[in-house]
């Protein structure tokens, strides 16, 4: 059973200061079988992981005061020191060209904005199943295409 799961109810931690992202993620994932919690600052993510023990952390790349990439790196560093349990991380990117940053911070998957419920659910389901997820985009154009994630 994954770390934060109680009776197979996944816990998802969302790190964003944008209300519209909370609304999209909440509408896509929160239901009787999934709990979604939010922090507004990257600096609060490690403490929230300690308290909630989430199955998945979703991080907005442009979260204020500590960017999403730095937040993901802090998670991986804390995991490496056994300070927190290993947690799946999904990055929400502003541009397709930021995929290389996801690979550098060792995130498990990514989505490129604008978001939609189907892609959010598909990515979350993959990461909750222990898989990686790459948004099917073309780096040159930002349009949908097959792009393999090398995470």
Over which residues does each language-model region extend?
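Alpha4 helix (beta4-alpha4-beta5 surface) of REC/receiver domains from two-component response regulators
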Residues: 70, 91-109
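C-terminal output helix
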Residues: 115-124
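Conserved acidic carboxylate
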Residues: 15-16, 93
């Amino acid at each position: 059973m994954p770390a934060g799961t109680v009776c197979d109810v996944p816990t998802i931690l969302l790190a964003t200061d944008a209300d519209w992202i909370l609304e999209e993620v909440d509408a896509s994932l929160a239901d009787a079988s999934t709990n979604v919690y939010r922090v507004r600052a990257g600096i609060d993510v490690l403490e929230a992981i300690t308290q909630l023990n989430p199955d998945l952390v979703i991080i907005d790349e442009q979260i204020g005061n500590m960017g999403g990439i730095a937040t993901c790196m802090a998670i991986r560093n804390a995991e490496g020191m056994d300070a927190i349990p290993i947690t799946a991380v999904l990055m929400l990117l502003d541009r397709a060209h930021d995929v290389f940053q996801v690979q550098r911070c060792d995130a498990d998957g990514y989505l490129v904005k604008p978001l939609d419920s189907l892609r959010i659910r598909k990515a979350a389901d993959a990461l909750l199943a222990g898989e990686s997820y790459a948004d099917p985009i073309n780096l040159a154009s930002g349009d949908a295409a097959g792009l393999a994630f090398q995470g």
